[in-house]
Swiss-Prot record:
Compartment(s) of residence: Cytoplasm
CDD domains per UniProt: HisA (cd04732)
Keywords, in A-Z order: Amino-acid biosynthesis, Cytoplasm, Histidine biosynthesis, Isomerase
Catalytic activity: 1-(5-phospho-beta-D-ribosyl)-5-[(5-phospho-beta-D-ribosylamino)methylideneamino]imidazole-4-carboxamide = 5-[(5-phospho-1-deoxy-D-ribulos-1-ylimino)methylamino]-1-(5-phospho-beta-D-ribosyl)imidazole-4-carboxamide
Source organism superkingdom: Bacteria
Family: Belongs to the HisA/HisF family.
Coiled coil: none
Enzyme class at the top of the EC tree: isomerase
Classification via PANTHER family: 1-(5-PHOSPHORIBOSYL)-5-[(5-PHOSPHORIBOSYLAMINO)METHYLIDENEAMINO] IMIDAZOLE-4-CARBOXAMIDE ISOMERASE
Catalytic center residues: D8 (proton acceptor), D129 (proton donor)
Descriptive protein name: 1-(5-phosphoribosyl)-5-[(5-phosphoribosylamino)methylideneamino] imidazole-4-carboxamide isomerase
Pfam assignment, any one: His_biosynth
BP term (GO), one: L-histidine biosynthetic process
Length: 240
């Protein structure tokens, strides 16, 4: 299972949120470029980067910093946050980003998602963020009446190969991932699934790996030292 250390960017700094609440923000490193390099040096093989400013503004805000992170870390990166037009997708991918995550627009603008998938294939991932099972958009500020599973099935029909699923109620809480929802997704859609939100320990990563998922994202647990990079490297090597 691929495990992605997460770097969330706000005002040019690495931060962590609690349950997606921008007022409950903790700065974990003032230098995201150094953080990206540190993860790579310690064995990370793929980074998950979210432009939180971009998610709020609806356009990429931290492009220059993200490019420098990619160049410095010298490993693949996937990026999400505020990607709502083909021009933005083009810019990221043409600047060397390996995969872009279309979040809010996956729900609000399915034609855009379809066009991006047709043009770039596996370089496009869909991000599904849900609260109590319903999809949230616009930096998690708006909650829709669409269930996470219904949207995942739509994404699969469009040709999306990778879905990143975040349970907002668990994000940044260290309460454990939502194994039930991940198992439900695994049963009903045949795409690469990446779990995000709530990972608190090596045991959580192992439990996700046992579901047969493609990947998992580790954020707060890494910064709080509940999980080490050596844990991540070791769990990635285990065959379940």
């Amino acid at each position: 299972m691929q495990i992605f250390p997460a770097i969330d960017l706000k005002n040019g700094q690495c931060v962590r949120l609690f349950q997606g609440d921008f007022s409950k923000k903790t700065v974990v490193n003032e230098d995201p470029i150094a953080q990206a390099k540190a993860f790579a040096t310690d064995g990370a093989t793929y980074l998950h980067i979210v432009d939180l400013d971009g998610a709020l503004e609806g356009r990429p805000i931290n492009l220059e910093v993200i490019q420098k992170m990619k160049i410095t870390a010298k490993i693949p990166v996937q990026v999400g946050g505020g990607i709502r037009s083909m021009a933005q997708v083009d810019y990221y991918l043409e600047s060397g980003i390996d995969r872009v995550i279309i979040g809010s627009a996956a729900l609000t603008d399915p034609d855009f998602l379809r066009a991006a998938v047709q043009k770039y294939g596996a370089k496009i991932a869909a991000g599904i963020d849900a609260k109590n099972g319903f999809v949230a958009t616009r930096g998690w500020l708006d909650v829709s009446q669409v269930s996470y599973l219904d949207l995942a099935k739509r994404m699969e029909k469009v040709g999306v190969e990778t879905i990143i699923y975040t349970d907002i109620s668990r994000d940044g809480t260290l309460t454990g991932p939502n194994l039930e929802q991940m198992a439900n997704l695994k049963e009903h859609v045949k795409v690469n699934l990446i779990a995000s939100g709530g990972v608190s320990s090596r045991a959580d990563l192992e439990a996700l790996a046992q579901l047969g998922l493609y990947g998992a994202i580790a954020g707060k647990a890494l910064y709080n030292h509940h999980i080490s990079m050596s844990d991540i490297v070791e769990v990635e090597q285990i065959a379940y």
